[in-house]
A protein has these predicted regions:
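Internal alpha-helical scaffold of NAD(P)-dependent oxidoreductase catalytic cores
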Residues: 39, 92-101, 117-159, 171-209, ...
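Rossmann-fold NAD(P) dinucleotide-binding segment
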Residues: 47-97
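NAD(P)-dependent Rossmann-like dehydrogenase/reductase catalytic/cofactor-binding core
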Residues: 130, 197-256
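Short, well-ordered alpha-helix to beta-strand connector turns
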Residues: 22, 55, 78, 100, ...
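NAD(P)+-binding Rossmann beta1-loop-alpha1 motif at the extreme N-terminus of oxidoreductases
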Residues: 1-46, 50-57, 96, 115, ...
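Small-residue helix-packing motif on alpha-helices
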Residues: 33, 51, 67, 188-195, ...
Length: 256
């Protein structure tokens, strides 16, 4: 499958690196497209329409506000389209690309290392018993290469964005805070970074193997009245749960 990228920003680069194969691409900043094509062994093309004509699957990585303008250039020649645009539901995408297969995915930056989660939006208009077409299967398998694929109702994809697409920045901040705390108490920053990130990666794998039972893992680490219990109590007093809830509200633009 020839993959064509419309836009060569951070997420487009992460996906291309995760796929590890040549891509066709276009970006208004020509240097970005050229750099990505050179890195991946692909080709930077001269227009959105040229990408559409040469790709088997066009992946929309542009700004959401550009949907109508870019669809006017891409739709006449595109064979299939996958969108990673935020706050752009399937109905709106299908309206812009009415005569071809259209898919909506939500990746996150760890796609670069084939890690993290990838959300696929389920089509609310599709009959439950309808079978996947060959292109449906090929596109789903392509994005599943980038991480753990989770299918959600289209209406929930933007909520998922606050949980996983934004989460690498949140996790990086948590790591930074832990490293800073250790550094202030004498551990060199390089060693503190290794300690925290290795523990984070190991805990994520442990949770996967324990069927995501966070309570069970916490109980194994936490002895009554012990140091971990005191640390957890301090985090709760500091409003850790409320902070993450507020962050999700901020992402969704909600007011409470």
């Amino acid at each position: 499958m020839n993959i064509g990228l419309i836009g060569c920003g951070n997420m487009a680069r992460a996906m291309a690196r995760g796929w590890g194969r040549p891509v066709l691409c276009f970006d208004p900043v020509a240097e970005r497209a050229q750099a990505l094509a050179q890195e991946m062994g692909g080709k930077a093309l001269g227009s959105n329409a040229e990408v559409a004509a040469r790709a088997d699957l066009v992946v929309l990585c542009h700004k959401p506000a550009q949907l109508g303008r870019i669809a006017a250039e891409v739709a006449p020649a595109a064979k299939a389209v996958a969108s990673i645009l935020a706050a752009t539901p399937l109905a709106k995408l299908k309206s812009a690309y009415p005569d071809i297969p259209v898919y909506r995915f939500l990746p996150s930056l760890p796609a670069e290392v084939r890690g993290g989660a990838i959300v696929q939006a389920s089509d609310p208009r599709r009959e439950p018993e309808s079978a996947d077409t060959p292109i449906d299967t090929e596109v789903r398998e392509l994005f599943a290469e980038l991480g753990t694929l989770v299918v959600l109702d289209d209406s929930l994809v933007d909520v998922a964005m606050g949980l996983m697409s934004c989460a690498p920045a949140y996790v990086a901040l948590v790591v930074e805070a832990q490293v800073d705390a250790g550094t202030r108490r004498g551990i060199p920053p390089a060693q503190a970074s290794v300690l925290v990130t290795a523990t984070l990666a190991g805990t994520a794998e442990l949770l996967r193997r324990r069927d995501y039972d966070t309570l069970a893992v916490r109980r194994e680490v936490t002895s009554p009245g012990g140091v971990t219990a005191r640390g957890l109590a301090a985090l709760e007093r500091g409003g850790l749960r409320a902070a993450f809830d507020d962050a999700l509200d901020a992402v969704l633009g909600e007011q409470r």
